[in-house]
Every structure is written in structure tokens, then in C-alpha cells.
Amino acid sequence: MLRGNAPAKVDEKGRVKIPSIFRAEIEQEFGNEFYVTSLRGDCVRLYPFPIWNELEQKIASLPQSDPAVKVFLRNTNYYGQMTTMDNQGRILIPALLRDSAQVRNEVSVQGHLKYLEIWNAEILRRQLDELPFSEEHEQALSKLGI
């Protein structure tokens, strides 16, 4: 499971080095191929390809006429691209997605159990301040058994 948060930097070529707290597990568990995408363009989602492939299989089994499926496919394909981690642990983020998510220089890489999110560090801080974990969130999770 990918968990935690680590700072990283996006270089001038648009590559981000995967922080060591995630890299070893990713290489061992999933290999070096990824699907890099976004749902809304506000952050980068980095899926190890085996995880993305599982998700695609689930989506493929759903009615393709469902509006949520259409929007999911439209957005993840618009922002998405296959990529390979190089020997130095770097992933190229497509220019379109770098610009949309404003991921330049200092970024925050967060584990989301099966995938990573890469955020502009300042935007993430604002998101955390604007939408703090509330009692409503706690109650909703309690209903899910957490």
C-alpha cells in the first residue's frame, strides 16, 4: 500500500523523481510502467500500470452510455499518457497536465493506497485549509465501518 506524503521537485523537462518512500514498493510490487492522468486537472494521478489495468477492466464492464463512465473516460484520456519510470526513478508528466495542475518546482507526492497523487504544494496546502477533516467526514467513515 502506498501511504504517506513526501516533497519532490519537477525538473525543467517536466520529470518528477518518485520519493524513496514510494519507489522501492512500486518497483517491487508493480514494475516501472505507469498511467499518468487526472480526473479534474487539479492534480496528477500516477497509477502503476497493473492497478490502472484493473480499473480499466472494471470501467469496461460498465455501460459505456453511463454519463459518469463517459466523463471518467473523457477526462482520464484527455490528461492521460502511458509512461515508464527511468533508472533514476523519474516519471515524465505530460505538458498539458503539468500546466493544468500547476505542478512545477516544489510538489507534494501523496500515497493513496494504490496510486500516487502529485500536487502543487501551495495548492494542496490551500485545499487542506479549505476542506478540513470534519465531524461529518468522521461520521460518514464510521458508517462505512472505519
Regions found by a protein language model. Give the residues of each.
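Flexible "stalk/tail and boundary" regions
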Residues: 1-7, 12, 23-88, 96-146
